[in-house]
A protein has these predicted regions:
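Nucleic-acid endonuclease domains
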Residues: 2-3, 8-122
Length: 122
């Protein structure tokens, strides 16, 4: 049994104060974006499936829990006094570092199994 935590986030204009539905960006936008994957709990799962949503594109990333916990962008302790839970921001400035985890919908099962293997063999 593979324990999976699925998180989704929208790519939104980082520099806008408009409501989320207004500042949602298209994939080919040149504006700075921020996707905040919140309440991430690496100790509670084996694999993460992250869904990044733009107005016109959906991207999937599959990471082992260890890959998330050890990622330099992972921030443990999202809220004061919180234990075992954090957040990770995927932005225009770091998205290329997550390309190796990207998956097509068709390959999600294969990539989930591969991430599970990485979780327990590396």
């Amino acid at each position: 049994v593979i324990k999976i935590e699925v998180k989704a986030s929208r790519a939104v204009d980082f520099d806008s104060s408009e409501p989320l539905y207004v500042k949602a960006l298209a994939f080919d936008s040149n504006k700075r974006f921020d996707m905040n994957f919140q309440q991430v709990k690496p100790a509670c799962c084996d694999v993460f499936v992250w869904v990044g949503v733009w107005r016109d594109v959906i991207k999937y990333w599959v990471l082992s829990a260890r890959e998330v916990q050890n990622n330099r962008y992972y921030s443990a302790g999202q809220h004061r006094g919180n234990v075992g839970e954090g957040q990770l921001h995927v932005k225009n400035s770091n998205i290329t570092e997550f390309m190796c985890y990207q998956s097509t919908p068709r390959d999600l099962i294969l990539n989930i199994r591969a991430a599970y293997q990485r979780q327990y063999t590396q």
